[in-house]
C-alpha cells in the first residue's frame, strides 16, 4: 500500500493485485470482550439477541481457519500483536485489582457492621440518621418504623435523608401502602437531601449499601466513618446490603419492607 501511494503521487501506473475473497479479519481483544459479554449475558435482550456460550465458542474456534486473520497478531511483524496482548493483560489485571479492592472494601463495611459492634456504637449515640439514595423507600420506611417501634424517651432522635438532589418528595406510594397495611404511616415524611450539616448532626448513619459509604466520603471521611449497614441489625446473620426496590416488582417491595422491619426490630432490642 505505501508503494501504491508512491506510484499515485508520482503519476505512475498503479500495480494492483487481485483481492482475496471470503477473508475475515479479527481482533483478539474484541473477541475476548465479546466472549465475556456472552458469558455474562451483558446486554439488554430487548435490543439484541444473545447467542449461547456454545455458539460463541464455535465462532471463536474459527480463528484456526486459514481464512481468518488477526489484524494485530502476525508472524511477519510481531510488535503490534505483542502490544495488543500487553493491553489485554493490563486491562484484565486492572479489572481484577479493582474487583479485589471492591471486595476488600465491602468486607470491611460488613465486618464493622456486626450486630455486637453496632450495640457498642449505640451506647454512646443519640442522633441516628437513615440514608439511602432517594429517601422515599428504604431510609424513609426505616425512619417511620424507628419512630413507631422505639419509645421517645429523649435519648434517641431519628432523621432520614438521601443522595437524590430533589427533596420534599412524598414516600413511594407502593412502599407507603405496604407500611400502612402493617399499621405504619409514612404520610408525614418528605424526602431530605443529604447535607454536611446532617452528617455532622448524626452519631450513626445507617446506610443500605456499601457504595453509600463511598458517597459519604465525598462529604468527609468523618461522615463515612459514622456509616454502618442497616442490614447489620439482623442479629441472626452477617450484615447484608438492602437493595433499592424503586420501580421493581411488588414482591421486591414486600421483601425490602420485611427486611427493614426486622432490622428496626433488632435496633429496638439494642436500645430499649
Summary of predicted features, one role per range:
Residues 100-122, 210, 214-272:
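Phosphate-binding/catalytic loops
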Residues 130, 207-208:
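Short beta-strand scaffold positions
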Residues 25, 186, 194, 242, ...:
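Short clusters of hydrophobic/aromatic residues that line enzyme substrate/ligand-binding pockets
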Residues 105-201, 272:
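Conserved active-site segments centered on acidic
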